[in-house]
Amino acid sequence: LPDIQEPLFSNLHGEKTPCVIMAAYGNRHYDDTLAQMQYRLEEQGFICIGAIAPVIPHIYSDILGKGRPDEKDIRIIRKFAVEIKKRLETGEQYGFASVKVPGNPLPAPKQMKPVEKSFDRARCTKCQVCVQRCPVNAISQETLQIREDRCLNCMSCVKVCKAGARGYDCSQVADYLEKNYS
């Protein structure tokens, strides 16, 4: 998980509250994400009764995860949902048990590789949808500039910009991922 996730978890509070964790990823690997989420949520009073990591299209590549989730994935997700429903029903009666997930809950921080971003002020309509949709508040409401120290390179701002004012050059990252993971 990015090291800027602190407010997300510190603002959540459970009292032995059951939860389900999910790490959707673009057919490369989700690394330690499930273990990190479980650790942080259980620190906040939750019990992780289920975890799933479905494959979705990769944000940087049109090849990785293309067509996912597919019918087989949907069947697996539905089966998982049925299992979670059963765990919730029996857990209310007998108590909830935490699941074991793969990964290191406290890995060494990884350096984010910056992705070259573009912002065309002439095309920008100043609608501020990018500001509102940025999951980590990395876009200044006043200047509309991206704070690199906060940006996850998730491309959410690019996806929601109807004017086409925002862009990312992720070709080098996509090339690497496609060569090594497709």
Positions of PLM-derived features:
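FMN-binding flavodoxin-like domain, especially the glycine-rich phosphate-binding loop
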Residues: 1-114, 169-172, 176
